Amino acid sequence: MNRTFAYVSAPNGESHAHAKLRNYCRQLYDLGYLPICPTLMFSRFLDGELPEERENGRAMSMDILRRCRVLVVCSNDVTEDMEKEILLAKRLGIVATTLAGIRKISLQAEPREE
């Protein structure tokens, strides 16, 4: 199985948003992508309230993004950190889209019955 890495760009926030992010990741997985969500991963071991750990999380997120082929924006509200991710993706030629955009692309790629 060879899946395209899809970076999930989402606001760092409250833990109640994590259920929504898990749902986004599941949908990407179901569409054939390998979802990578630093917000979910790093919240398990980094304390976003500590400036050094927050900055390390940002740096690690950007490093992960550089290895991905697609950036998926999973929020209507784009934070400053998300904007930086989108700009880096653009600079590196990484496709940036939304979950709806990924769904549309995936549906168009499916073979059509005649």
Give the residues covered by each predicted segment.
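Conserved catalytic or regulatory cores that recognize and/or transform ribose-phosphate-containing ligands
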Residues: M1-E114
